């Protein structure tokens, strides 16, 4: 999903990407290979999160004056990342259909701190017991200001709406 979004935006914006993981640089390398944008890996030494200080140190590797958008892909769980401020202007999270529409009930903080929630793999709705409207209702009950968008990385559905949101929010900064 991230690579698909970057590939659609990179003609309009100068984009950088940071990937956070415990070990390896596989994710950063994958993003760089698929998109051609500079991507660096932040190794978090076994922690389940990163914070603004770690991001600040990683920013030294970028010429931020020549970036229009810097994307930080945090650790992929729904608990720890919500508890720590990364210094990001906006928080975006990804919930996929196979994970279930009950995730907002189980991990409320992540949904409370997210500005945009993308519900991915909507092309698989017929195969899973996932109620999109119920998931959206649960998210908005926790965070009335959140924007909830259905997307499919596979088909591209919804990606233009995500890009529109990113562009509008970027203009507000």
Which residue stretches match the model-derived regions?
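Nucleotide-state-sensitive switch-loop elements of NTP-binding domains
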Residues: 1-89, 102, 111
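Structural beta-sheet core signal
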Residues: 17-19, 93, 117, 150
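Residue-level signature of catalytic and energy-coupling elements of molecular machines
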Residues: 21, 73, 120, 135, ...
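Short, glycine/polar-rich helix-capping loops at beta-to-alpha or helix-loop-helix junctions
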Residues: 25-29, 103-107, 131-137
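Short glycine-rich anion-binding loops that position phosphate/pyrophosphate groups of nucleotides
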Residues: 75-77, 97-99, 123-124
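Inter-motif core of Ras-like GTPase G domains
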Residues: 81-98, 107-119
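N-terminal/domain-start segments enriched in small and hydrophobic, helix-friendly residues
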Residues: 106-130, 166-167
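Canonical P-loop GTPase G-domain recognition
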Residues: 124-173
């Amino acid at each position: 999903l991230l690579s698909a979004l970057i590939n659609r935006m990179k003609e309009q914006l100068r984009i950088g990407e940071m990937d956070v993981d415990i070990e390896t640089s596989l994710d950063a390398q994958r993003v760089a290979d698929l998109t051609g944008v500079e991507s660096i890996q932040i190794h978090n030494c076994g922690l389940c999160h990163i914070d603004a200080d770690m991001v600040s140190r990683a920013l030294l590797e970028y010429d931020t004056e020549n970036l229009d958008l810097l994307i930080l892909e945090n650790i992929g769980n729904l608990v720890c990342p919500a508890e720590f401020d990364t210094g990001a202007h906006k928080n975006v999270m990804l919930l996929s259909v196979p994970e279930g529409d009950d995730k907002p009930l189980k991990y409320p903080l992540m949904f409370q701190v997210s500005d945009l929630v993308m519900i991915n793999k909507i092309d698989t709705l017929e195969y899973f017991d996932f109620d999109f409207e119920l998931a959206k209702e649960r998210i908005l009950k926790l965070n009335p200001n959140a924007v909830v968008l259905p997307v499919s990385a596979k088909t591209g559905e919804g990606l233009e709406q995500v890009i529109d949101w990113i562009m509008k929010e970027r203009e507000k900064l």
